[in-house]
Amino acid sequence: MEKKLSSENNQLSSEQILGLLPHRYPFALVDKVIEHIPGERAVAIKNVTINEPQFQGHFPERPLMPGVLIVESMAQVGGIIVTQMPDLPKGLFVFAGINNVKFRKPVLPGDQLIISCELLSIKRQRFGKVKGEAHVDGKLVCAGELMFSLVN
């Protein structure tokens, strides 16, 4: 069954995202896609709340979103781009690597992470590279390149 986009500015609801990505609670880290050009780029929102399980241990006295989860949220937005490539075989694309990731500022409960990803390249119809950035209140908090691989 082909997955259809919302007609509203190529946005994706949380239900549509769940139809594209295999991630589920507590690892579904994209709440809404607010801009989407299939196979090219996407901009998404991750609302960071104190109710998320990682804040029980990271850190109880001063909760911070773990950097690996910021990168994972960028990877999930990148995964939305890669899964929508019309010429690629259908299957499970997994996170295969990162390059030049830098963390600039902490992300706290109550923040809204705005994640932008853009496709950089596809090789041999099974490897993809995406440039990702995450912002809070217009300030860059994390950026880097993310790689994906198609698993048979």
UniProtKB/Swiss-Prot annotation:
Keywords: Cytoplasm, Lipid A biosynthesis, Lipid biosynthesis, Lipid metabolism, Lyase
Disulphide linkage map: none
A GO cellular-component term linked to this record: cytoplasm
Catalytic residues of the enzyme: H58
Swiss-Prot/TrEMBL catalytic activity: a (3R)-hydroxyacyl-[ACP] = a (2E)-enoyl-[ACP] + H2O
This enzyme's EC code(s): 4.2.1.59
GO molecular function terms attached to this record: (3R)-hydroxyacyl-[acyl-carrier-protein] dehydratase activity
Main location: cytoplasm
Keyword Iron-sulfur: no
Function, in words: Involved in unsaturated fatty acids biosynthesis. Catalyzes the dehydration of short chain beta-hydroxyacyl-ACPs and long chain saturated and unsaturated beta-hydroxyacyl-ACPs.
Protein name as it appears in the record: 3-hydroxyacyl-[acyl-carrier-protein] dehydratase FabZ
Organism: Prochlorococcus marinus (strain MIT 9215)
